[in-house]
């Protein structure tokens, strides 16, 4: 079966042959013989061949292509026929009729390329001709892009590309055709560079010899004499020409296309020849492999180029004055004669595309190409077999053609080449963009050389042009360069960034705004490259001799983000974008670290050394780039593939390894180079500390450089002082510094090294140059560019002499002697001046080569120098000036600067470090956060666009996240402070705040951000807390906070909560409540509110504001404070504490609100409260103790202290300190304390109910009971504390009130784990502070007065708070405790009694530590409740309106404002004022019921304790023995019980027996009777019973003699009668032990005295009848017991007691003896204990000497011992004067009997009445009694007391 492809070819043959035959030329002749026409003959032959085969593959591609190619080459064919042949060829390629694997394919492709690029046809009209050109483009594109195109040679590809360029740049062609050519070029360039990774680098020698063949013409067609494309074999004209040239010329339309295209205008206007040559030379010069050539100027033309030019035979090449690619040739214009000659020669038949001019104007080129040996037969058929036979087989194209194309594209971008039009430059930039996007160009060293030099230079020059399209395209190419290969372009990148900064900052009005915008866009784009910013910092800011690019750019961008006019433009936002890029990348890295902590830890375990890590990262980065480029390539090629079966990218992919794989391989090779580290670093990734050192050193170097540039010695000296240069000066070191530092003034270097004092330094300086292999002029050029040559001849001589010596030693002394060398060097300098100095050129004709040779004749040791060397030197100097630094300007200077840049890039200084993403983020952030936050703040403030505002907020949040990640508190504080300004909360007045805030969306965003950041990153917040708290305070003032934040706990309020936002009281102006309410609603002044109510807009704004604050959730700051780091927590507390009283800004409610927040925070942090306790405690101390008057804040402080105690007592580690802190309340002024008694009483009750089990220490119990006493009964706090509080008033608050009780022998202070910061107290307005320390001295001098260790350890727990010394005198024989009770509140007393009841009734809460305290407190409460507390109420005067709940939460309005609080606490002294109308509001109707309940409760409690005391003490003693615990030994004997329990309790009960209220009095008497007759008291001995009489019964009887209840006379009579009966009963019941007392007579006489008093006390007969009967009973019992009989009396005479008794009785019952004993005669007395009268009379009248426990008693009132007025005078006198009389009219002293500390308590027991032989039962009275409200001060009734027994316990303290 015949191959279908054969039919396709046959069809195409028929079409073309038919067209040839139909041509007008054939119409006038008979059909020609095909044998005579070569074209038809070829087709005929092909037909025969095709008919003889069945498969197309059986014949070579050349066979079926040749006829078509001959048609294309034929000069005689018309355009349409040529077009048909081109269409056929294109079809063959598109249909893949050519087998890529066929061995003849290469030859066929080469012939096809040659034919199409040299297509010739007879032109008709321009439109038809352009159709043919379009088809040529199409064939060339298809040829290169299909798989068979890979067989093309380097030369063919260059031909194809150049053909396309000619069409593209020919302005006479239509735009459509030129654009088609442009698109074709794009596809071709993309294909070629996509295939770049497949090609291998060729040996340099191969590159050097082959490049000459492949140079595409860089100039226009007129420059044929300069750039000659290599000629192919001659092409003779066709043999069978029908028409002579002459006949064709006259034809009007006979001009061929060539004539049309070349009439006086060149096809291509491209860069000049020297430009191309020098660009190629430079690429070789800067190649990293040629170190020796690095020091050559990049503008020198290499020998290779010069040779090439000579071979090209161009006379102009040696006469051009170009000194570099930027200079223009002297003669670039085409010779007119040459132009006309060309036109004539080519008029008949010309090539349509490639080489119109070269063949006519240039001699044959001798540099052979692959095709130079081809033979072309007369028909134009080329035969290449001969060359293959000779061993020159066709080589597929590779790197050489790509390099040549790349060089050509770069040459197109030279803005200084006048041949390069704007369109050409743009085209070059566009194709370079495609090339860089398609391939990893940096891996190709041959291309890299071109990039480093010419390409970068042209691009930077283009940044200065005013054409925006070129400027933009240049920026695009620059981005691609520095994105992918910045590691090779360190100093180029530095120059680029500097140029961009210059463009942004320049104030030139001609500079378009768009250029600045694009420059900023370019920076933003670069900054978004991962790690780019970090690399800027590492490679430039941390390089001694580079600019601080990152720092400078950051400053520039920050400054540029602030609009001068106030209006935001794109440039401002772009600057912000750039700054945010750093923030974004850093934040992303931080997020990744946070999210992948575990993964990173695993990586660390298996991590490699740092340099390997860097390499791998770079490799990964490169691979990533390759992948990205690959994707871009694919996408682009998809778009460009058009209808072809096989697009360019498919062709590139065909038969090659994956691009990524190749690139990775290349990168892995390049990585070896990356491991080189810059000399300034100790390792590849230096740590931040090292970078800081480098930066510091860099600053010093810059300063030293500046000083050197002014005075070299001064600069060197400065660097030596700073340790950067050694002392003494090291010449080698200084020379190296002079060479390395580009900032040094070249003139100063010249002067310094040429100084005759520095000869050694000059030698060292010269030795830093490497002159090996360099010609003298080249070495001199290098030498003289390093410094400015001074003008003095001796100095020049010295410098040149050193140079020539070094050059000779480096090059083996090539000249005769050093003088010859010196002369030549001098001659070169003179030549340079002669050729390039403008002044010299004006006066003289420049020296010629011959003159130069003549000048040096015979100088080389009498001989001549080699003429070739002199010629080379002459041309080198003539063509390129030796630039004297800082002498030239303009282009010459630019060339010099560029050569220096290239030179630096080739040294180790040019190493560019690539770093992994995330490295040095902290360093970068530290440098950028300030400018960034400032810019963000400005943009946020000025912008109204939502997107920009959100961008700014996002930036704020990211900055916050980074600062939190790295723990940068100062950054976060700055950010919060900045944001707080935008919340509008601090600037607005309170009246307008809800409206203004509610209607400001930007303020909402700022507020939400502030609170969100505080919630999320509060850990690192420090100073910012203050701003946040100020904002919250503003919200509080404006009543915008949630209800939960303004409601606080309260002990007294029935709901348990009150609001901190109190109602306003009506002002003095008489404003009505309605107006006040309206004013409050509108949040405006009374003037406005009285006119109109709140507007709808204001209401809506307030609603929006409330919603916003709800979303902010400020309460979360409190609830989540438990998660804050300790330091942040302390700062938060410090911010809250700082809102305290000062002159200006103080507001009581603000302070109360802050206090409540502080307390809530402390409670939230109770797990670590020890760390912050001192702060809060000292703050509470300040608020409470310093308060001079009561105010709301003081009340909240007191409540807060109690709340803390209630919550924190459960925590063992802090409970002691908390309880000690309650003593703050005792330090308050009594007047202030009494005003908060309600709160304290209720708070203490709550505390004891919830935490009694957690109180263990006696000191703690002492604190609580003292508080109960002060609050419940108005007892003044212990004097020691009050004295201390007064003394510390100017300097309170900084003391530790916990030191006293913790001052033990081995435990000086409590460890709080946290030392209070002095700043906590700086706002308190006190001058000096004494801060805590652990020293004893500090303890003693602290707020709690430590009197002495012994005082603390030995004092009674009841005293509790270190009694003052000396102690005031206390009467032990009074029923009261002897304290001065101040005013107290009955409700408070009732609550305190409840608290006491709770303790007493629960056996678990009564402990040895608190028993005595409890008893003492009971007695104090008894005294306070006497007569219903009338004494206290009288003292209080009018009750405070504070006690009224109605006024408790009202506040006085500030004048002129309804909303504002008064600013000073004095305006707020109370929650309300005094009011007569409401005087009794604090004493409700049930007051008397309440007071009665209090007294009854106290009675019950005392009786309970009394009955339980014995069992309680027994159990404690047993427990102590069982546990063998240490501490104070607990005794359960009767003496202890009496002294500590029974006696004080009986005194308390007896005290209530003196109550003015009859019910209380009678009930108390009943309790007293039960108590005295209880079974446990039978254990008491005689002394204790005597004490009972002296301390309980006698004071009771004394008190009852007073007129307690004047209104209830009968009741008082009954009371007195019951009391006297009780006295008699107790006396008789315990008569037996009492008789053993040595003081019995005194006791008995005292009883008689009371009988006397009582008998005359009442007005009724009740007592006058009852007393004698009681007395008779006692006398009879005593007489029966023979007490009145003297033991030693003779004859049974009566004893002295008998005499004394009747002396006393006779005073008031003179007839009783007769009545009782008239029939009785006293018998001999029974034996009794000897009681002598002397003993009675003398021993016990005075206290025992030296007994410290006995204190003198108060005076005895005279009426106690006096008889009634009717008594005989003599009797009275006897009584008074008798030494044994128990009573005396004159005052006398007595000593108390021994007693221990006060009593305690225990559960109730069943009363068991006793039966005693001496007991006489007296029925109890039950008569109603009316009480007298007076209180009588008790006095001791008896002056006679016994001395204590030796075994009695010595009292340790008094009951106070």
From Swiss-Prot:
UniProt record, GO biological process: protein transport; regulation of ARF protein signal transduction; vesicle-mediated transport
Region (Disordered): 215-256, 291-370, 601-626, 1284-1333, 1430-1484, 1739-1806, 1837-1856
Annotated Basic and acidic residues bias: 1432-1446
Pfam (any one): Sec7
Span list, region Phosphatidylinositol-phosphate binding: 884-1370
Primary localisation category: Golgi
Subcellular location field: Golgi apparatus, cis-Golgi network; Endoplasmic reticulum-Golgi intermediate compartment; Golgi apparatus, trans-Golgi network; Golgi apparatus
Record text on subunit structure and interactions: Can form homodimers and probably homotetramers. Interacts with COPG1; the interaction is independent on ARF1 activation. Interacts with ARF1, ARF3, ARF4 and ARF5. Interacts with RAB1B (GTP-bound form); required for GBF1 membrane association. Interacts with GGA1, GGA2 and GGA3. Interacts with USO1. Interacts (via SEC7 domain) with PNPLA2 (via C-terminus); the interaction is direct. Can form homodimers and probably homotetramers. Interacts with COPG1; the interaction is independent on ARF1 activation. Interacts with ARF1, ARF3, ARF4 and ARF5.
Domain statement: The DCB (dimerization and cyclophilin-binding) and HUS (homology upstream of Sec7) domains are necessary for dimerization. The DCB domain is proposed to support constitutive homodimerization; the HUS domain interacts with the DCB domain which may occur intramolecular or intermolecular.
Protein name: Golgi-specific brefeldin A-resistance guanine nucleotide exchange factor 1
Native organism: Cricetulus griseus
Protein encoded by which gene: GBF1
């Amino acid at each position: 079966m015949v191959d279908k492809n054969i039919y396709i070819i046959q069809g195409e043959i028929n079409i073309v042959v038919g067209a040839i035959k139909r041509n007008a030329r054939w119409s006038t002749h008979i059909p020609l013989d095909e044998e005579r026409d070569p074209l038809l003959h070829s087709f005929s032959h092909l037909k025969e061949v095709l008919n003889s085969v069945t498969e197309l593959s059986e014949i070579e591609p050349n066979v079926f292509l040749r006829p078509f190619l001959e048609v294309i080459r034929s000069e005689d064919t018309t355009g349409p026929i040529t077009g048909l042949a081109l269409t056929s060829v294109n079809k063959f390629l598109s249909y893949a009729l050519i087998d890529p694997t066929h061995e003849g394919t290469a030859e066929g492709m080469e012939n096809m390329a040659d034919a199409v690029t040299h297509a010739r046809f007879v032109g008709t009209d321009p439109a038809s001709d352009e159709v043919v050109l379009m088809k040529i483009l199409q064939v060339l594109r298809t040829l290169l892009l299909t798989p068979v195109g890979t067989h093309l040679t380097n030369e063919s590809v260059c031909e194809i590309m150049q053909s396309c360029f000619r069409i593209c740049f020919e302005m006479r062609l239509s735009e459509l055709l030129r654009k088609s050519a442009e698109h074709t070029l794009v596809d071709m360039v993309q294909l070629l560079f996509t295939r770049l990774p497949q090609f291998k680098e060729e040996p340099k020698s191969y590159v050097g010899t082959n490049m000459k063949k492949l140079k595409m013409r860089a100039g226009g067609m007129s420059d044929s004499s300069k750039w000659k494309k290599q000629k192919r074999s001659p092409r003779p004209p066709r043999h069978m020409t029908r028409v002579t040239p002459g006949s064709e010329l006259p034809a009007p339309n006979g001009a061929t296309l060539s004539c049309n295209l070349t009439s006086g205008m060149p096809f291509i206007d491209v860069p000049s020849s020297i430009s191309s040559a020098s660009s190629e030379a430079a690429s070789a010069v800067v190649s990293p492999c040629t170190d020796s050539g690095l020091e050559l100027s990049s503008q020198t033309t290499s020998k290779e180029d010069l040779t090439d030019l000579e071979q090209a035979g161009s006379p102009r090449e040696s006469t051009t004055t170009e000194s570099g690619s930027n200079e223009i040739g002297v003669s670039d214009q085409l010779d007119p004669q040459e132009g006309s000659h060309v036109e004539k020669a080519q008029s008949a038949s010309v090539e349509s595309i490639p080489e119109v001019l070269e063949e006519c104007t240039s001699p044959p080129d001798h540099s052979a190409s692959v095709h130079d040996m081809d033979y072309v037969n007369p028909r134009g058929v080329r035969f290449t077999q001969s060359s293959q036979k000779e061993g020159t087989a066709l080589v597929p194209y590779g790197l050489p053609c790509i390099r040549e194309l790349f060089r050509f594209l770069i040459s197109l971008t030279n803005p200084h080449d006048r041949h390069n039009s704007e369109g050409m430059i743009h085209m070059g930039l566009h194709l370079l963009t495609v090339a860089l996007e398609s391939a990893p160009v940096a891996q190709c060293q041959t291309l890299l050389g071109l990039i480093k030099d010419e390409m970068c230079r042209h691009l930077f020059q283009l940044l200065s042009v005013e054409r925006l399209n070129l400027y933009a395209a240049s920026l695009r190419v620059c981005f691609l360069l520095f994105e992918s290969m910045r590691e090779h372009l360190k100093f180029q990148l530095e120059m680029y960034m500097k140029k961009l900064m210059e463009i942004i900052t320049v104030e030139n009005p001609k500079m378009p705004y768009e250029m600045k915008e694009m420059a900023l866009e370019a920076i933003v784009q670069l900054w978004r490259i991962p790690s780019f910013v970090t690399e800027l910092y590492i490679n430039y800011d941390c390089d001694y001799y580079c600019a601080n690019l990152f720092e400078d750019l950051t400053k520039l961008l920050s400054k540029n983000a602030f609009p001068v006019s106030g209006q935001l433009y794109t440039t401002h936002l772009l600057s912000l974008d750039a700054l945010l890029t750093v923030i974004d990348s850093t934040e992303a890295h931080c997020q990744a670290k946070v999210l992948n902590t575990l993964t990173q830890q695993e990586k660390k375990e298996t991590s490699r050394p740092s340099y390997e890590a860097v390499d791998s990262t770079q490799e990964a980065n490169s691979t990533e780039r390759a992948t990205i480029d690959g994707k871009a390539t694919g996408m682009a090629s998809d778009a460009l593939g058009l209808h072809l079966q096989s697009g360019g990218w498919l062709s590139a992919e065909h038969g090659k390894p994956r691009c990524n794989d190749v690139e990775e391989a290349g990168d892995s090779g390049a990585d070896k180079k990356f491991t080189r580290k810059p000399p300034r670093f100790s390792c590849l990734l230096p740590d931040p500390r090292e970078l800081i050192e480098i930066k510091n050193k860099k600053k010093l170097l810059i300063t030293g450089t500046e000083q050197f540039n002014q005075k070299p010695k001064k600069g060197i000296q400065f660097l030596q002082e700073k340790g950067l240069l050694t002392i003494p000066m090291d010449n080698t070191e200084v020379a190296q510094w002079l060479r390395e530092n580009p900032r040094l003034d070249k003139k100063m270097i010249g002067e310094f090294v040429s100084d005759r004092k520095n000869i050694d330094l000059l030698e060292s300086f010269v030795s830093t140059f490497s002159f090996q292999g360099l010609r003298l002029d080249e070495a001199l050029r290098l030498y003289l560019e390093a410094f400015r040559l001074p003008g003095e001849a001796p100095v020049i001589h010295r410098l040149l002499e050193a140079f020539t010596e070094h050059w000779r030693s480096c090059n083996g002394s090539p000249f005769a002697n050093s003088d010859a060398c010196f002369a030549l060097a001098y001659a070169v300098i003179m030549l340079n001046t002669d050729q390039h100095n403008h002044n010299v050129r004006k006066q003289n004709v420049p020296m010629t080569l011959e003159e130069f040779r003549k000048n040096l004749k015979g100088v080389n040791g009498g001989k001549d120098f080699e003429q070739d060397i002199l010629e080379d030197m002459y041309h080198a100097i003539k063509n390129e000036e030796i630039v004297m630094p800082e002498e030239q300007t303009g282009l010459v200077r630019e060339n010099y600067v560029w050569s220096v840049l290239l030179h630096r890039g080739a040294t180790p200084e040019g190493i560019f470090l690539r770093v992994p993403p995330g490295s040095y983020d902290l360093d970068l952030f530290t440098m950028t956060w300030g400018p960034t936050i400032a810019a963000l703040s400005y943009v946020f403030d000025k912008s109204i666009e939502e997107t920009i505002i959100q961008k700014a907020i996002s930036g704020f949040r990211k900055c916050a996240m980074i600062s939190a990640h790295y723990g940068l508190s100062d950054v976060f504080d700055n950010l919060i402070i900045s944001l707080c300004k935008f919340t509008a909360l601090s600037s607005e007045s309170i009246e307008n705040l809800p409206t203004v805030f509610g209607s400001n969306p930007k303020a909402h965003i700022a507020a939400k951000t502030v609170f969100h950041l505080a919630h999320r990153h509060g850990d690192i917040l420090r100073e910012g807390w203050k701003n946040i708290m100020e904002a919250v305070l503003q919200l509080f003032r404006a009543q915008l906070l949630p209800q939960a934040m303004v409601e606080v706990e309260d002990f007294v309020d029935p709901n348990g909560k009150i609001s901190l936002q109190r109602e306003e009281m009506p002002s003095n102006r008489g404003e009505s409540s309605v107006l006040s309410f309206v004013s409050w609603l509108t949040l405006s002044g009374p003037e406005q509110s009285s006119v109109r109510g709140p507007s709808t807009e204001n209401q809506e704004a307030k609603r929006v504001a409330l919603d916003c604050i709800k979303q902010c959730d400020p309460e979360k700051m409190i609830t989540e404070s438990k998660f804050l780091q300790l330091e942040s927590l302390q700062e938060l507390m410090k911010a809250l504490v700082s809102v305290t009283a000062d002159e200006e800004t103080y507001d009581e409610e603000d302070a109360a609100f802050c206090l409540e927040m502080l307390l809530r925070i402390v409670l939230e942090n109770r797990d670590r409260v020890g760390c912050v306790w001192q702060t809060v405690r000292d703050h509470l101390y300040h608020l409470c103790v310093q308060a001079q008057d009561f105010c709301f804040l003081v009340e909240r402080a007191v409540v807060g202290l109690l709340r803390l105690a209630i919550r924190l007592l459960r925590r063992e580690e802090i409970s002691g300190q908390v309880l000690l802190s309650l003593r703050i309340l005792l330090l308050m002024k009594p007047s202030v304390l009494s005003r908060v008694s309600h709160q304290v009483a209720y708070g203490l009750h709550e505390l004891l109910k919830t935490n009694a089990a957690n109180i263990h220490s006696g000191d703690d119990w002492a604190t609580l009971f003292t508080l109960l006493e002060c609050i419940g009964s108005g007892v003044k706090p212990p004097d020691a504390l009050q004295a201390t509080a007064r003394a510390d008033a100017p300097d309170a608050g900084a003391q530790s009130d916990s030191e006293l009780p913790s001052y033990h022998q081995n435990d000086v202070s409590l460890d709080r784990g946290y030392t209070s910061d002095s700043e906590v107290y700086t706002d308190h307005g006190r001058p000096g502070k004494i801060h805590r320390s652990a020293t004893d001295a500090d303890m003693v001098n602290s707020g709690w007065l430590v009197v002495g260790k012994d005082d603390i350890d030995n004092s009674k727990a009841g005293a509790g708070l270190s009694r003052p010394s000396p102690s005031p005198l206390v009467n032990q024989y009074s029923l009261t405790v002897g304290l001065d009770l101040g005013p107290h509140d009955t409700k408070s007393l009732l609550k305190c009694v409840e608290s006491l009841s709770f303790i007493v009734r629960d056996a678990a809460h009564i402990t040895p530590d608190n028993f005595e305290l409890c008893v003492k407190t009971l007695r104090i409460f008894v005294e306070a409740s006497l007569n219903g507390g009338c004494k206290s109420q009288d003292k209080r005067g009018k009750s405070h309106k504070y006690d009224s709940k109605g006024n408790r939460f009202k506040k006085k309005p500030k004048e002129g404002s309804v909303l504002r609080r008064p600013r000073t606490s004095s305006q707020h002294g109370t929650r309300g004022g005094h009011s007569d109308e409401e005087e009794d509001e604090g004493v409700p109707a049930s007051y008397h019921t309440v007071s009665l309940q209090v007294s009854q409760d106290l009675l019950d409690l005392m009786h309970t304790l009394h009955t339980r005391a014995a069992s309680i003490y027994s159990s404690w003693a047993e427990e102590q023995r069982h546990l063998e615990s240490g501490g104070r030994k607990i005794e359960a004997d009767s003496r202890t019980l009496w002294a500590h329990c029974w006696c004080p309790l009986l005194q308390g009960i007896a005290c209530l027996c003196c109550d003015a209220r009859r019910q209380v009095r009678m009930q108390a008497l009943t309790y007293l009777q039960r108590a005295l007759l209880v079974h446990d008291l039978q254990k008491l001995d005689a002394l204790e019973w005597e004490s009972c009489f002296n301390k309980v019964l006698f004071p009771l009887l004394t008190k009852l003699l007073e007129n307690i209840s004047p209104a209830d006379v009968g009741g008082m009579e009954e009371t007195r009668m019951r009391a006297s009966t009780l006295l008699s009963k107790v006396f008789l019941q315990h008569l037996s032990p009492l008789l053993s007392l040595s003081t019995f007579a005194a006791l008995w006489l005292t009883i008689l005295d009371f009988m006397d008093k009582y008998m005359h006390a009442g007005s009724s007969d009740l007592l006058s009848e009852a007393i004698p009967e009681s007395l008779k009973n006692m006398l009879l019992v005593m007489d029966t017991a023979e007490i009145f009989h003297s033991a030693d009396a003779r004859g049974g005479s009566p004893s002295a007691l008998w005499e004394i008794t009747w002396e006393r009785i006779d005073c008031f019952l003179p007839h009783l003896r007769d009545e009782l004993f008239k029939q009785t005669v006293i018998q001999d007395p029974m034996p009794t204990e000897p009681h002598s009268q002397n003993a009675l009379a003398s021993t016990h009248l005075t206290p025992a000497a030296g007994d410290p426990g006995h204190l003198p008693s108060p005076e005895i009132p005279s009426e106690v011992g006096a008889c009634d007025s009717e008594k005989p005078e003599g009797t009275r006198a006897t009584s008074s004067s008798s030494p044994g009389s128990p009573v005396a009219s004159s005052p006398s002293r007595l000593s108390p009997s021994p007693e221990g500390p006060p009593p305690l308590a225990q559960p109730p027991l069943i009363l068991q009445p006793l039966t005693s032989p001496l007991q006489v039962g007296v029925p109890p009275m039950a008569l109603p009694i009316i009480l007298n409200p007076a209180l009588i001060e008790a006095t001791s009734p008896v002056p006679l007391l016994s001395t204590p027994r030796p075994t009695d316990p010595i009292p340790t303290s008094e009951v106070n």
